[in-house]
Amino acid sequence: MLDWVHRNGKILLAIRPIQAFAASFVSISFAIYLKTLGLSISQIGLILTGGMISSTLFNLGAGFLEARLGRRKLLVFFGLLSASAGLVFSTSVNTSILIGAAILASIGYRGGFGAAQMLERVILAQSCEDSRRTELYAIRNTVGSLATATGSLFTGLLVLLASWGYSEAGAYRVMFGIFTALNLVLVFLYILLDEEAEIKLEETKQVVLGPETKRYLVLISVLFSMDALGGAFITQSLVAYWLFERFGLAMDKIGMIFSASSLLAAASFMAAARISKRIGLINTMVFSHLPASIMMAAIPYMPTLGTSMFLYLGRSLLSQMDVPTRQSYTMAIVKPEERARFQSLLNLPRSFTLAIGPSIAGYLMQFIGIGTPFLVAGVIKAVYDVLLWVTFKDIKPPEEEK
């Protein structure tokens, strides 16, 4: 099974569900936990923004330092950083210290925007043949999404801990302790990666991006920054807060909604790999993502929880098809030796717009309307979809040119 995947690729596939499980239950409970400490939603948005700025700097640094320090050492460092932040959250009640740890380690975000995941995707790209690259990314995202679903349900432990006599804050600290332990497991698995994970000797010279790659970098950066800005308005932490405030849902119910969302996303990942072989990567990205963007914009106008969740879950089934296809496409159109540098530079403007989004969303939720971020996100993402198709529909990856 998976005999076409290099050993390092298999290790990274084992890492992904642990990583996703831990990030899922923390990101769902993060904003609500900070609210119990007395912070407003606009302040929480600023903390999320600070975390993404920190992640952006680490992302950029990893792209430039991977050849000098090694990918494995960087991955171990990022794993220890997350574990340390989790330890702080599980032991401290000092708000200032918690905010510092959250910003430094980007606690509260779920997804593939961290420096560790950027390095993992680069290693994965060299763990199989080009013809199966999209399939490998789809498998990685599928196991991650299934683990995210499980992690979402795991937030129900908060309710169980409360029934056992734990205080509200004490229950949250137990969850962060589990987050710490899981990140230490990730560190151990990163250590198992072999030399093939590193940049090849002939690639260790200063990488200079070619003219065509630079052109792709500018175009994709602008477009992906738009998509990231839209996504930043609806992070899992902020959606959980919206469900908590708008409908008064308990954490176990919120966890069930996110679990269902992740299961639908998991189904879409493998479908994306199959569909992309028939209609191409760009067409798969746009034709699935555009309807999802329209659904997102309509969510706050739904009169009941049921109708809102019908659209939210429908969006989950469609919107994530662009994840493995996007990851595969951006690896395919550049040379192997350019990939890490390209990805780190590509993520820089994207991470910036992702960083400012939660602050704006928090302001909109507090002062304009709690559902406003859904509308803004949907409109931005729909414009992105159209521009992406117009710009890149004729630029094919190698496997589509054969």
Predicted regions and their residues:
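Hydrophobic core of transmembrane alpha-helices in multi-pass small-molecule transporters
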Residues: P17, A85, T95-A115, T307-M321
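Conserved MFS/SLC helix-loop-helix module at the cytosolic interface between two early adjacent transmembrane helices
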Residues: L57-V93
